Amino acid sequence: NTRSRGLGDVYKRQAGFYYKTFMWPKSFWYKIYEPFIRKAAGLGVASIEKDKERYEHKFEYCDLLVTGSGPSGLASAYAAAKNGAKVILAEDKPRFGGTLLTDDVSIDNLSGKDWAEKIITELKSMPNVTVKNRSQVFGYYDHNMLVMFERVSDHLEKKSKFTPRQRLWYIRAKETILSTGSIERPIVFGNNDTPGIFLSAAAKEYMKVYGVLVGKKPLILSLIHISEPTRPRI
């Protein structure tokens, strides 16, 4: 195990052990025990400085809200928009396309990446469509009320003083399509969260999207065929 070990790892105590351990004397709890425990837990202190950034709230409605811009999300948003629906397409990551950016697929005689770019370009040109990247839909409430967090300018080197840093959207949608994709199921073993261990989907994204090689001599462990298309790429 190469992980840096914290205080809890050293003493290997179960969670909440201090509630039964530091019982006596009672007067020590607030002055000695609790301050020590909170310091050991690494709890931070909230800043008292004024935040100079701008933040906005926005209220919007739509016929269809699509979360995720993979193949199913793009196809759904495009079909609805072509039929005149007011559509909002939300993508959490900076780039649209989802698995189309990493998988070798072909749609309408185009590569997945080129097809995604074509659809996004068309969607952006439609007056009834709002396309947002760096935007995470994190709340789904009664009567199709959804809340979306947009990172507006954190990635910009230069920006106007009137440009908000972040924007919180309150969206009332008639219909919602959750096209957030699926998460690759990991193989569970001890310390499988240490640096240098990747899911195949993550390894492909590093290579295809960011141009980063995860290793020169990788060991690939898989129980299903999903690693077959990944192996030659690595």
Which residues are covered by each model-predicted region?
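FAD-binding core/adjacent interface of flavoenzyme oxidoreductases
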Residues: R3-T67, K113, I120-K217
